[in-house]
């Protein structure tokens, strides 16, 4: 039986699908699929029996509630980078649960993304003010990988050939240490764990990572250590707690070169490990090496301030194997939440929360001392760690009282532990503290002491923050809920997302993110768990993960799946590390060559380099396919050293290549493994399986194919599926039992961004195998329908052997530059006037656009987009004929803002109506660009990546 959810997920009705098939010349869907998907990989039937049959929303939610109920939401005071936090209801309602925020894409088209960019600029300003460093990025994946990025940056900047040592604070978070080990080994970096004050620095040291506060809560003044590191020519990274930093002097004042951390405790639930927005701040000197997205201010064609992504030439999609990082998708939605949390509280509110935690921690320490526990000397922020023979009794007593504490040593059985750690947080109350102390007293065999008031004196041993901070008006003007609600809505009105219309970005799969799929993410049973809570308390998450892994394995034809990678780029990296580990287990350490087609996503070569592999390019032929003769030559040339081929399927040119089985067999004959980039898996689900036609590893983008929303640039999840012989090498984690051959972790938490996995679970549970197959078929049909409509106006550049495209098509705009002086950016900006986000521009071929409609868009929406593109082509024809001016025309002047259209003066040779309302239906559904066309070059030359201060505004007003 067909899933009742199918008609909600798929846009075109049955009759509309038949209409589209008829337009393409097919009698039915089966005939169409036989023409599109190569016969030798097309599965006759979907994997029935391996997935449950589809069901409705209510039934799926009932099943998922049963799973969630198996989680035990004890109050976790474990700390280690994850803390209880109170998400303001306003932010949960108007941001986290608002599709205008979570369905947008990365803000490449900045003129229709000003709201999101402003929220991210607020985030960057927050981090810059907390750290005292002038440049902060718009988020990274988690604190551990941010620290690894800092290590890589430090290594890349160092020019001393003998420098390959990276010193790491012994008090670093355990997950950070583990991720650093994973990242360092393939790059030839020697890690050394040290007590910072006792560390020796010489010319072999290129960088240092300090933790402030440390994993045990200690805070200290690192100024002298940093000075010694600088004398030896090493860069210093400090991993910070942003809430502690509200009280501690900015780390830049200690001399830090880089600061990293997680903004999780700024209003984002723990969620069993993620997703959370990490951050990376540094000195201006290193702005061109900073990983991830960077929002900067520029100006538009009218001279008004405008925001956009800055310094993009340093990123992986341009620099490829020379990129500073493979990061693309990060954690924009979570960074936006954290920024609004800071706007909601303001600097005084943040400091008040931090002071309250310090006071409660001092109360706790006095109670511990009165019970006979030895509290270590030194100053702390929120955490106290105690070594005691009573530790097993403590863990039992606090567990019975409903608490989890850190078990020392990390990973030990509580019954055999030698100590415990207690981390207080924003959610700690006086009553909770009393119950905790009572449990500690029970363990000590004593009467519970009263909790004396503990006034917050000055922090000892570390300079405090004394200068004003967050003086920007945005952090002071919205402290009332009314003002903040209106501010959030103002930003929403400056953005375009799926609530406005189709976003036809090729290779991005902007499909429906159904409300029922997202609803469970905010359930406390999923949101409230600490990732290092005892596994027995996470039985629901384990069951969810096991089912999701099994379903994904069935759909892809692989033997095993890891859900740990928290982005597609990290899935690539993890998959290549798995291949590398397999080769090394066989004594083939010398296999280090990775073949990559020149058409590949930029993350492919960037990930290969990170995995310690040497990239060898493989040519593509005139039809966009892998040049199989060149592939055979390269495979033969490097046969003794061949580790892997990275291949995207369907290809990045939007077609099913007919020789994929032969390609896989060729690589295997030469001793290599096949890594399949799953960015285009939405064209395969239910129709063909990578594991069945020869791939050994494939990463899946749950934020594309399996309905996790893009969030304006994250979160994402990039799990990997592997063949049976590679399963023992899937990523492990230091806080859980892992197979002996497992590679190290690639994410801070064992399940990566665990709290958004219910989204994909809901999608698969509601759809079932047959509906998934139908959805994929409609995605292919919609792309071919658009190709049919648009080809007479914009030639489709690449087609498969039967003349069909896969789930996306590339339109060739290059002749328009020659004939009319119109380039791809002109068309992208003009589409905004028609109410559309542009397709992917100039990738994988410069001067083209790649269109991917997905299965979720109705025939009416497909036609609306086609009508807009055709209308723009007719405007270009007017330029070609001379009927319209070559420079002063609707395309060159696009996009048109409301301010421009209603201005008293209108000196353009076309009407205001043609500028703003070129199609009749726009009178009722107009999306206005917030700014005119942005001058990107000006912004990069005059880089401004934070909000202006009050003083800067005053100077500007006076001028």
From Swiss-Prot:
It catalyses: N(6)-[(R)-lipoyl]-L-lysyl-[glycine-cleavage complex H protein] + glycine + H(+) = N(6)-[(R)-S(8)-aminomethyldihydrolipoyl]-L-lysyl-[glycine-cleavage complex H protein] + CO2. Keywords: Oxidoreductase, Pyridoxal phosphate. Its cofactor is pyridoxal 5'-phosphate. It is an enzyme of class 1 (oxidoreductase). The keyword Coiled coil does not apply. GO terms for cellular component: cytosol; glycine cleavage complex. GO terms for biological process: glycine decarboxylation via glycine cleavage system. Disulfide bonds: none annotated. Coiled coil: none annotated. GO terms for molecular function: glycine binding; glycine dehydrogenase (decarboxylating) activity; pyridoxal phosphate binding. InterPro entries: GcvP, GDC-P_C, GDC-P_N, GDC_P, PyrdxlP-dep_Trfase, PyrdxlP-dep_Trfase_major, PyrdxlP-dep_Trfase_small. The keyword Transmembrane helix does not apply. Its EC number is 1.4.4.2. Signal peptide: none annotated. The modification N6-(pyridoxal phosphate)lysine is found at residue 704. Gene3D superfamilies: Aspartate Aminotransferase, domain 1, Type I PLP-dependent aspartate aminotransferase-like (Major domain). The glycine cleavage system is composed of four proteins: P, T, L and H. The glycine cleavage system catalyzes the degradation of glycine. The P protein binds the alpha-amino group of glycine through its pyridoxal phosphate cofactor; CO(2) is released and the remaining methylamine moiety is then transferred to the lipoamide cofactor of the H protein. Belongs to the GcvP family. This is Glycine dehydrogenase (decarboxylating).
